[in-house]
Amino acid sequence: MFPEQQKEEFVSVWVRDPRIQKEDFWHSYIDYEICIHTNSMCFTMKTSCVRRRYREFVWLRQRLQSNALLVQLPELPSKNLFFNMNNRQHVDQRRQGLEDFLRKVLQNALLLSDSSLHLFLQSHLNSEDIEACVSGQTKYSVEEAIHKFALMNRRFPEEDEEGKKENDIDYDSESSSSGLGHSSDDSSSHGCKVNTAPQES
């Protein structure tokens, strides 16, 4: 008998559906939906979506770099002083750059084991709460934060809508940043260790 053929693992990520969000009367920003589909043992739930803004990506890159000093991290799209959120070309160039960044990050096994990355991709927590959770300063664990968000957000976008939405921007949306349906990273039980130890600042 032949040994059972192992399935090749994959992690697919899309950054899509940019939306203008109102911060206050004078200030707005754009956030992007990050969707993941995977069969990787590092993830328990195989599909996830969350909304993040550019400055959260900047924080994530800094966080990952501080936790993996010897890893050469991919670059983010540069911060353009003349960035115009009403310019579709500007928005789509940034969206594509953010997607390329995440795709490269998710190909690195060391970065994929970082709890900060999992919480960024699979929870509603902001950067301060992610840092607190990873360093053990919250009542909930990394896994609990992700599972709670997964229970609150079960819907995942239809794949056949991806092509329509990927490059569209909703200029009238004032909805809050919320995810749709999330996966968890109970990866310690699958041999993919997630770093939850406190980090030195």
Swiss-Prot record:
Effect of residue 53 to A: Abolishes vacuolization induced by overexpression
Membrane topology reported for the UniProt record: Peripheral membrane protein
Source organism superkingdom: Eukaryota
Residues given in the record as a 1,2-diacyl-sn-glycero-3-phospho-(1D-myo-inositol-3-phosphate) binding sites: 53, 79, 94
Protein transport is among the record's keywords: yes
Annotated segments matching region Disordered: 156-201
Record-level GO cellular component terms: apical cytoplasm; centrosome; endoplasmic reticulum; endosome; extrinsic component of endosome membrane; nucleus; secretory granule
Main location: cytoplasm
Gene Ontology molecular function, alphabetical: 1-phosphatidylinositol binding; ATPase binding; phosphatidylinositol phosphate binding
UniProt keyword annotation of Transferase present: no
One Pfam family in the UniProt entry: PX
InterPro entries assigned: PX_dom, PX_dom_sf, SNX10/11
GO biological processes: bone mineralization involved in bone maturation; bone resorption; calcium ion homeostasis; cellular homeostasis; cellular response to leukemia inhibitory factor; cilium assembly; endocytosis; endosome organization
Keywords: Cilium biogenesis/degradation, Cytoplasm, Cytoskeleton, Disease variant, Endosome, Lipid-binding, Membrane, Osteopetrosis, Protein transport, Transport
Location(s) in or outside the cell: Cytoplasm; Endosome membrane; Cytoplasm, Cytoskeleton, Microtubule organizing center, Centrosome
CDD domains on file: PX_SNX10
Domain PX positions: 10-127
Function: Probable phosphoinositide-binding protein involved in protein sorting and membrane trafficking in endosomes. Plays a role in cilium biogenesis through regulation of the transport and the localization of proteins to the cilium. Required for the localization to the cilium of V-ATPase subunit ATP6V1D and ATP6V0D1, and RAB8A. Involved in osteoclast differentiation and therefore bone resorption.
Domain observations: The PX domain mediates interaction with membranes enriched in phosphatidylinositol 3-phosphate.
Associated pathology: Osteopetrosis, autosomal recessive 8: A rare genetic disease characterized by abnormally dense bone, due to defective resorption of immature bone. Osteopetrosis occurs in two forms: a severe autosomal recessive form occurring in utero, infancy, or childhood, and a benign autosomal dominant form occurring in adolescence or adulthood. Recessive osteopetrosis commonly manifests in early infancy with macrocephaly, feeding difficulties, evolving blindness and deafness, bone marrow failure, severe anemia, and hepatosplenomegaly.
Assigned protein family: Belongs to the sorting nexin family.
Subunit structure, as described in the record: Interacts with ATP6V1D; may play a role in ciliogenesis.
Name this polypeptide is given: Sorting nexin-10
Organism per entry: Homo sapiens (Human)
Lineage summary: Eukaryota, Metazoa, Chordata, Craniata, Vertebrata
